[in-house]
Amino acid sequence: GLVLLSPQADLTESGDSFQVNQLVDVILPGSLMRNNQLYAADAELSHPYLSPLFGDLTGFPPSFLQSGTRDLFLSNTVRMHRALRQAGVPADLHVFEAMPHGGFMGNTPEDRDLAGEVSRFARACWEGE
């Protein structure tokens, strides 16, 4: 299985959460476009190797995706979940209320809940469920 915790699946930042959540995500400083361009060098940001959201997801393993309502990458996560489902990939989406990018640093009931959900998903994958 594949576990995607607040994934950066679209380096073009085309999802609306890059605008809507800029002032509420306490972990990420806003647009990461300069970093994305540096990382991509001369490649197109929408190339599937850089932004898997735009690629062929057929054959991906069962996937677990997580984000929070205050995460800059919320749109990435929701759109990636839909793209996986459209490609016929079993995928679960978990969105946590008020959670910023990366969660609450491991010290909250939400973080413990997330850890439990990831463990259950991994166990199910290992057991072939």
Spans of features found by a protein language model:
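Alpha/beta-hydrolase superfamily serine-hydrolase fold, recognizing
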Residues: 1-129
